[in-house]
Amino acid sequence: MTTATQSSAPGVNVDQAEVEKFSALAARWWDPESEFKPLHAINPLRLGWIQETAGSLSGKRVLDMGCGGGILSESMAVAGAQVTGIDLAEKSLKIARLHGLESGVKVDYRAVPVEELAAEQPGQYDVVTCMEMLEHVPDPASVVRACAALAKPGGWVFFSTLNRNPKSFLFAIVGAEYVLRLLPRGTHSYDSFIKPSELATSARQAGLEPTGMRGMEYNPITQVYSLSANTSVNYLMSTRK
């Protein structure tokens, strides 16, 4: 995997600029017409894919790494999982907790680096999700290792991120951020995108075996997202420990 040059506290795998970027938008996490509209739109696809692969989430311990305002965390909790959501953007976690209180959905939100949690709770989770997150940290391979450590033997770890090629630059940055304005400008850095082969290598090195991959596409005419076999831009990868 490529590693972007980022500013972060010594020993902590975090890009402070990324944390501040999402903190500035925290109040709008649950507005389906805000900058987070794409996440609301793709969430049913993500949840369905996780359930299709890992089976029912009812009663399972699930970790949502990089949970932000809790969009995926809450939906997995509604599906019956015992969910822990972690993020380093305190403002986003505050919004997640408030929304959980309003909706009556119980999720344990914590501000802790995933590497620290892995040392604290190794092998404790049936399912670990790391969605739209790897491209926002200085050392994605470290996150993959931590996710693997947190999963139980036989547990599932799910990733989603962006492929790195000319098409993904055109679609995910030029198209999504500048033409269609689906995302704020500067949301993504092309150098931080990760090829599926790179993610698969990091997963195997961490003791995870990739089991499947799906692409995610957006139709600007119908404004609908769908899963597909096309992994050239957005893709999801399932792995098992």
From Swiss-Prot:
Molecular function in Gene Ontology: 2-polyprenyl-6-hydroxyphenol methylase activity; 3-demethylubiquinol 3-O-methyltransferase activity; polyprenyldihydroxybenzoate methyltransferase activity
GO biological process: methylation
Keywords: Methyltransferase, S-adenosyl-L-methionine, Transferase, Ubiquinone biosynthesis
Biochemical pathway: Cofactor biosynthesis; ubiquinone biosynthesis
Entry's EC annotation: 2.1.1.222, 2.1.1.64
Catalytic activity: a 3-demethylubiquinol + S-adenosyl-L-methionine = a ubiquinol + S-adenosyl-L-homocysteine + H(+); a 3-(all-trans-polyprenyl)benzene-1,2-diol + S-adenosyl-L-methionine = a 2-methoxy-6-(all-trans-polyprenyl)phenol + S-adenosyl-L-homocysteine + H(+)
Binding site for S-adenosyl-L-methionine: 46, 66, 87, 131
The protein's role, per its UniProt record: O-methyltransferase that catalyzes the 2 O-methylation steps in the ubiquinone biosynthetic pathway.
HAMAP family listed in its UniProt record: UbiG
Family recorded in the similarity comment: Belongs to the methyltransferase superfamily. UbiG/COQ3 family.
Protein name per Swiss-Prot or TrEMBL: Ubiquinone biosynthesis O-methyltransferase
Native species: Bordetella pertussis (strain Tohama I / ATCC BAA-589 / NCTC 13251)
Encoding gene per record: ubiG
